[in-house]
A protein has these predicted regions:
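C-terminal catalytic/motor cores of large multi-domain enzyme assemblies
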Residues: 2-314
Length: 314
């Protein structure tokens, strides 16, 4: 049975409304270049950002793991279909994109003590090395997805961006901007960053800067498994608006006892997540990541577009 058709949980008051395709929204006063302000939230959701003004002080931490048998089978299938290099990262990102299609409240963010939604723009940031060597430079790529993207769509978008940054683009826009800031003396740089924070607080930061900023988006994901180490709890940045940091580790084997008393060896991957609790209620976050685990148990559902896409409140 398709996991997405199983929606036994009752929707919360400020959860979402069903609509497909996405309703067209006119830009209103108070909206930002990267999202629209949510004006129909419950009072507590509007007050909590003033009680917990910083992202670092409003972070919640949790960890979990998933058994990788079905994911490995799925990866082999996709590679046999010609998707070279398709791996766990693609499955995790595709699963997260699918979460947003069913739990759009997870795609919210805080800025200037107000709650906004990215709407149908799912922005995921990823750090990559230009070459797999110790000396190779790192850069950050920003990927845009939509709630209807399949695993194949996710693969194509990621592959295109990585190839562009590794081959045809020696300096990304972010790298070029960082080099410019590097020439500014320390005291002036501190004031420049303060001014950027001020613009961002009031939603006046230009869209061009938001687009190259690694501190703005829906989620930041990092693979510690590629380094051969366990996942870490990575802090959220007080600058920008990224509300979720997702870290996953390397595969490992675990012995488990079956019902008949025999021992079976299975492979798992651990992951750790840090979230800004102010974006939505705990029910939305918990049910969203429960959905993610269901997709990891049956990743083949990611080959098809979601039957229904849910959109956030106004």
């Amino acid at each position: 049975m398709d996991q997405e058709s199983q929606r036994p949980e009752a929707e919360t008051v400020e959860q979402q409304k069903e609509s497909s395709p996405a309703p067209k929204r006119k830009r209103r006063f108070g909206d930002r270049p990267d999202g629209y302000r949510l004006r129909s939230l419950q009072p507590m959701s509007k007050v909590s950002p003033y009680i917990m003004p910083d992202r670092s002080g409003a972070s919640v931490y949790f960890h979990d793991s998933f058994e990788v048998t079905e994911v490995e089978n799925y990866i082999r299938k996709k590679r046999n279909q010609g998707l070279k290099g398709f791996g766990v990262m693609h499955v995790l990102i595709a699963s997260y994109v699918r979460i947003i299609s069913q739990r759009p409240a997870v795609n919210r963010f805080l800025s200037g003590q107000r709650v906004y939604s990215h709407g149908d723009d799912i922005v995921i940031n990823l750090t990559i090395k230009r070459e797999m060597t110790l000396e190779a430079e790192e850069t950050i790529i920003k990927m845009h997805f939509t709630p209807t993207d399949t695993a194949d769509d996710v693969y194509r978008k990621i592959t295109k961006l990585i190839e562009e940054n590794r081959q045809t683009n020696p300096d990304s826009d972010f790298d070029s901007t960082a080099k410019i800031f590097n020439y500014i003396p320390g005291l002036l740089l501190k004031n420049a960053v303060w001014f950027l924070k001020l613009l961002d607080y009031f939603g006046l930061l230009p869209k061009s800067l938001i687009e190259i900023s690694p501190f703005h988006g829906s989620m930041f994901i990092t693979s510690m498994g590629s380094l051969g180490v366990p996942p870490v709890y990575h802090h959220l940045y007080n600058f920008g608006n990224i509300p979720v940091f997702f870290s996953f580790g390397a595969k490992y084997k675990r012995n488990e006892l079956k019902d008949d008393g025999t021992v079976v060896q299975r492979k798992y991957i651990d992951y750790k997540v840090v979230c800004d609790e102010r974006i939505c209620d705990g029910f939305n976050l918990a049910s969203g990541f429960k959905l993610m685990k269901s997709y990891l148990k049956n990743p083949h559902v990611l080959d098809e577009k979601p039957q229904v896409v849910y959109h956030d409140v106004d």
